[in-house]
Amino acid sequence: KNVLDYFIVQNNEYRFVTKDFGIVSSFMRMTSELFFIHQPYKLKEGRIVYAVSGQVTLSINLIQYTAKKGDLLLLAPNSIIEMHEFTTDFEMRMMAIQNDFIQFLNKDEVLEYYIGRRENLFLPLSEKDYEMTERYFFLIWDTVHEEVFRKEVVQSLVSALLFNISY
């Protein structure tokens, strides 16, 4: 399935997708046909995902996790994910980032540091870090919806978000 296909999602107002960057403000309201329960899915690009409400049980490269509000996942390209179950109030936000999207950075920095390595990171955020992540997310969301898409601004904001994550 091609995420650039406009018809793969019923409510496109909850997502913004280019060939090297995607952002989803409401995974559940988007009503996607990309993921199904108990269907493994191989990620082509790195992902920044965080839970906003509810709870989900999923496997990432055969390791099971339970994510709830405030949990952030940094997923490496080529990871295999499978959703097992989620509560009816589960909601998450997500960004998908191709490695080419962040080539302007030094290899040891930002996304390469987190997602470019072949590891995944599951990080429970403090309330302060969660609120800051929300602010960064919606600043990026608002920026991609400007009349003119400024890729460099989005790249810098994504970098700032990742630099701000402390663990």
Language-model segments: residues:
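Generic protein-terminus/edge-of-domain signal
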Residues: 1-59, 63-65
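A hydrophobic/aromatic-rich effector-binding and dimerization subdomain
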Residues: 6-17, 83-142
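Tight coil/turn sites that cap or link beta-strands
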Residues: 33-35, 69-70, 78, 100
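A structure-centric signal for secondary-structure junctions around beta-strands
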Residues: 45, 69, 89-91
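Residues immediately flanking
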Residues: 53, 77-79, 97-99
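Short beta-strand His + acidic residue motifs that chelate non-heme Fe in jelly-roll/DSBH
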Residues: 57-59, 75, 81-87
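Short acidic-glycine-tyrosine-enriched beta hairpin
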Residues: 62-76
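An amphipathic alpha-helical interaction segment
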Residues: 128-167
